[in-house]
A protein has these predicted regions:
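Primarily secretory-pathway and cell-envelope proteins
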Residues: 2-69, 73-75, 102-172
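Short, acidic Ser/Thr/Gly-rich low-complexity loop/linker segments typical of extracellular
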Residues: 76-80
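Short, surface-exposed beta-strand/beta-hairpin micro-motifs centered on an aromatic residue
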Residues: 82-87
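A short tyrosine-centered beta-strand micro-motif
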Residues: 95-97
Length: 172
């Protein structure tokens, strides 16, 4: 009997089975930026501003770095449970985060676009903190270290968040 989290058992839930019959498949992404097939064209800055994102045990996290000015996603990152991913070359500007937590990531390819989502224990949040990576033409390098842990089904982070739904997470 395995634990109810990604990689610890081979039990397919009825929801996952229904999704598989509609073209979805289980996937174990590596940590880092998703490729452009996920619908986000990554935007890079000239300086090495970065986020270090550390995830505790029990859940993986998909993170969207959102421009405060345009409310548009500039980077879409996957961080597997128990790992740290460094997101380099964040452009100057102000950002907030959208976070999807969960287990059992599944993907479905439709044409040249790939959809992805957690299919067990999924929940979604948005940061209320604004991460300021400096003014345009500044030479100062800015870095943030984010620590994300899920304890008893809720996130315990070193930044503030509010709950959002899956649709709000998906909207760029």
């Amino acid at each position: 009997v395995g634990k109810d989290k990604q990689g610890d058992n081979n039990v397919v839930t009825p929801v996952q089975e229904a999704m598989m019959s509609n073209g979805w498949e289980l996937s174990t992404p590596e940590g880092g930026d998703f490729d452009e097939s996920m619908g986000i064209k990554p935007v890079y800055g000239l300086q090495d501003n970065y986020f270090d994102i550390t995830i505790g045990q029990g859940f993986s996290v998909a993170v969207k770095i959102m421009s405060l000015k345009e409310h548009k996603c500039i980077r879409y990152i996957f961080v597997p449970e128990g790992q740290t991913v460094t997101v380099n070359e964040i452009p100057q500007g102000k950002y907030y985060l959208k976070l999807a937590y969960g287990n059992d990531w599944m993907v479905k390819t439709e044409g040249n676009h790939t959809l992805g989502k957690f299919t067990k224990n999924a929940f979604y949040e948005k940061s209320t903190n604004i991460f300021d990576f400096g003014m345009k033409n500044s030479t100062q390098i800015v870095n943030y270290k984010l620590e994300i842990n899920v304890i008893d089904g809720s996130a315990k982070n070193n930044f503030q968040t509010i709950a959002i739904n899956e649709t709000e997470f998906e909207n760029d």
